[in-house]
Amino acid sequence: MDLAALRDQQRQRAAEVVTQDDFDIMPPRFIGGADVGFEQGGEVTRAALVVLEYPSLQLIEHQVARIATAMPYIPGFLSFREMPALETAWCQLAQRPDLLLVDGHGIAHPRRLGVASHFGLLVDVPTIGVAKKRLCGQFTPPDAAPGSCQPLMDKDRQLGWVLRSKARCNPLFISPGHRVSQATALDWVQKCLLGYRLPEPTRWADAVASRRPASDPLLRG
């Protein structure tokens, strides 16, 4: 596997990422969530996409795609591993979202092309990265109160936000994916929080991708 070529591709695509607001519909009528899991010891990639109506944040659709895993896990190149299954699930959606929250990083990536940015470019939709762990950048820990946040920085450039979404929980790392500004990325993640650590779109996508039981009848069967 030619990692040097993949790095070059990441840098080239990162230059195409738009970090200003460019929404087709504002406020969005439908907000999506995306997450990826793996089966059979990593041999099968399972991508989940959910669509919620806004402002009710009610789940209206979910799709799951399972395909053979394209490449092994290599830190910094996760999008190449996850994107084929995500694209397959995206093509199955009857209702495409106006905004997509992705479990993973946007521009808060060593080469500024996390899966949220990479996938946003692929399908040309506004995306936001919502990650559970830091990949790069420095920050001051946010206060303990829910809603507290601090910028995630790389020297003098802001990569995203570190958000305390729930008390007594580790913070989330929020960053623009594509066609979304820093301020708007933080704003929409906060609007999608309903008392859990994860915002509703990625919370539902995580449940579907992880195959955990869910109370909503739409997920049964």
Swiss-Prot record:
<dbReference type="GO" id="GO:0043737">
    <property type="term" value="F:deoxyribonuclease V activity"/>
</dbReference>
<dbReference type="GO" id="GO:0003727">
    <property type="term" value="F:single-stranded RNA binding"/>
</dbReference>
<comment type="function">
    <text>DNA repair enzyme involved in the repair of deaminated bases. Selectively cleaves double-stranded DNA at the second phosphodiester bond 3' to a deoxyinosine leaving behind the intact lesion on the nicked DNA.</text>
</comment>
<feature type="binding site">
    <location>
        <position position="103"/>
    </location>
    <ligand>
        <name>Mg(2+)</name>
    </ligand>
</feature>
<dbReference type="GO" id="GO:0005737">
    <property type="term" value="C:cytoplasm"/>
</dbReference>
<keyword id="KW-0963">Cytoplasm</keyword>
<feature type="binding site">
    <location>
        <position position="35"/>
    </location>
    <ligand>
        <name>Mg(2+)</name>
    </ligand>
</feature>
<keyword id="KW-0479">Metal-binding</keyword>
<keyword id="KW-0378">Hydrolase</keyword>
<dbReference type="GO" id="GO:0000287">
    <property type="term" value="F:magnesium ion binding"/>
</dbReference>
<dbReference type="GO" id="GO:0016891">
    <property type="term" value="F:RNA endonuclease activity, producing 5'-phosphomonoesters"/>
</dbReference>
<comment type="similarity">
    <text>Belongs to the endonuclease V family.</text>
</comment>
<feature type="site" description="Interaction with target DNA">
    <location>
        <position position="73"/>
    </location>
</feature>
<dbReference type="InterPro" id="IPR007581">
    <property type="entry name" value="Endonuclease-V"/>
</dbReference>
<keyword id="KW-0227">DNA damage</keyword>
<keyword id="KW-0460">Magnesium</keyword>
<keyword id="KW-0540">Nuclease</keyword>
<dbReference type="GO" id="GO:0006281">
    <property type="term" value="P:DNA repair"/>
</dbReference>
<keyword id="KW-0255">Endonuclease</keyword>
<keyword id="KW-0234">DNA repair</keyword>
<protein>
    <recommendedName>
        <fullName>Endonuclease V</fullName>
        <ecNumber>3.1.21.7</ecNumber>
    </recommendedName>
</protein>
<dbReference type="Pfam" id="PF04493">
    <property type="entry name" value="Endonuclease_5"/>
</dbReference>
